[in-house]
């Protein structure tokens, strides 16, 4: 028989509390139970005056942002519109059915006038992470580091070319000391001091967002973007991150991220990273500090048809290289970049049968370079071949890459709607904090057991089964049905038969 809906219910007056209208298993209930946000009052009390009209509750402001990022709402304007019609969102904020929701510009004005130059968002991120750790959900034996690019809110056709000074490497001083030491051991004079004129490079600078960087996204696509180098644990909780322009290499932004992570996590064992971080300086730092760098095989950047560097065997005792034709390449010098140069005898190489596969130089001299910290890179290769390292590295796709995938697909991380490094950092701080909070809320909910109004059925299951099969005629042929389920689906939290 075809049924017809009576739409008079739309105008019926019913007595119900807002709490009754929000499903017991809704995510907002899990968020509310996961962490007490009242600590925000102590963090912002000095940012408000002691007189005048009462402001909007700062905890409510933060909860509005949490709703935006947790549910992946693209803008604050749309977030406010969703809150106006969504009973669960109103319940989470503590707003009644007829209470006016704050204007969409409220958070922006509060950020500009109060929160801009504070560490409030960083403290919220840290507090959530502390709660995760207190619940025992952090697994920091293996830390996974990687970078992703976030498209900037900038027109790729509006830019100007500028000449900038090349930034010095953060380990430049240590490297120069190692170079001088290496040259003295080989009987070479110290390098002359560099000219005072600094090195310069040409860059495309956006006129819309100068803090962003020109990023080559694939072979035919270039955009202005930001880079977020991020560290997470085995359970996908974000430990910390570092935001830079999109044209900054991962190995450059690693150092600030490593400093932050070292302050948060004291005794990690493995640092799992991709080939973008595989440089001698990073390998040296991790190994000397007792960490185990887990990095992949990196294909040698050799011209097609030429011997690879691995085809030249290094003799550590005599400090020389042997070529595929068993000729010796002797030490020549150590350059400013920290590479020892080993050169062959051009007279012997002139008639070598492998010359076309070895070198294309006019004087027939083959030069093989070796970094002064190359020994650490060899240790990284040894670690790569150890038992279990391959399995640890393969966890990247389930951890850090999953963090980026969820962030971009579910929480609006693919694009940034803000301009400037400070605002983008604020956005990512809140985004990662909300991702951690969402996972924390779900995990705590599961750890606490089933919390829904049907859960009491498990207590009375024997009575229910007796009535079903013994006292009600024909009941054994009826399938259990839960009125709270959607579209007549079976609710497994109510019945187990």
Role assignments for model-derived ranges:
Residues 1-29:
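Hydrophobic alpha-helical membrane-insertion signals
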């Amino acid at each position: 028989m075809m049924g017809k809906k009576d739409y008079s219910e739309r105008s019926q007056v019913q007595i119900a509390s807002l709490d009754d209208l929000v499903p017991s298993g809704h995510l907002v209930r899990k968020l509310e139970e996961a962490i007490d946000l009242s600590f925000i009052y102590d963090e912002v009390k000095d940012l408000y005056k002691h007189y005048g009209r009462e402001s909007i509750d700062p905890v409510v402001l933060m909860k509005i942002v949490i709703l935006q990022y947790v549910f992946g709402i693209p803008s604050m304007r749309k977030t406010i519109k969703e809150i106006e019609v969504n009973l669960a969102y109103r319940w989470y904020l503590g707003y009644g059915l007829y209470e006016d929701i704050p204007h969409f510009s409220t958070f922006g004005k509060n950020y500009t006038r109060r929160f801009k130059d504070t560490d409030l968002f960083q403290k919220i991120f840290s507090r959530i992470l502390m709660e995760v750790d207190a619940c025992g959900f952090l697994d920091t034996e293996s830390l996974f580091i990687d970078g992703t690019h976030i498209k900037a809110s900038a027109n790729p056709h509006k830019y100007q070319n500028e000449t900038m000074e090349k930034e010095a490497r953060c380990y430049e001083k240590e490297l120069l000391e190692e170079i001088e030491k290496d040259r003295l051991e080989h009987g070479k004079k110290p390098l002359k001091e560099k000219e005072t004129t600094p090195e310069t490079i040409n860059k495309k600078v956006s006129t819309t967002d100068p803090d962003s960087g020109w990023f080559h996204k694939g072979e035919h696509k270039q955009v202005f973007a930001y880079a977020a180098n991020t560290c997470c644990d085995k359970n996908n909780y974000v430990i910390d991150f570092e935001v830079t322009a999109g044209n900054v290499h991962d190995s450059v932004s690693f150092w600030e991220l490593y400093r932050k992570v070292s302050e948060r996590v004291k005794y990690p064992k493995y640092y799992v990273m991709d080939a973008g971080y595989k440089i001698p300086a990073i390998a040296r730092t991790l190994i000397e500090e007792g960490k185990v760098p887990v990095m992949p095989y990196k294909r040698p950047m050799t011209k097609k048809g030429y011997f690879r560097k691995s085809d030249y065997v290094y003799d550590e005792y005599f400090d020389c290289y042997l070529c595929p034709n068993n000729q010796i390449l002797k030490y020549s010098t150590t350059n400013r970049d920290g590479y020892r140069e080993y050169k062959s005898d051009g007279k012997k190489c002139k008639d070598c049968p492998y010359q076309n596969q070895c070198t294309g130089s006019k004087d027939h001299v083959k030069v093989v370079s070796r970094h002064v910290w190359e020994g650490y890179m060899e240790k990284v290769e040894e670690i790569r071949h150890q038992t279990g390292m391959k399995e640890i590295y393969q966890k990247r796709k389930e951890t850090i890459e999953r963090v980026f995938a969820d962030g971009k697909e579910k929480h609006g991380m693919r694009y940034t709607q803000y301009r400037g490094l400070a605002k983008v950092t604020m956005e990512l701080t809140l985004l990662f904090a909300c991702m951690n909070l969402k996972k924390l809320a779900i995990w705590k909910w599961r750890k606490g057991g089933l919390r829904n109004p049907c859960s009491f059925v498990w207590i009375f299951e024997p009575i229910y089964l007796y009535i079903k099969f013994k006292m009600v005629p024909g009941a054994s042929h009826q399938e259990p049905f839960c009125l709270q389920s959607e579209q007549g689906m079976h609710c497994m939290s109510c019945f187990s038969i």
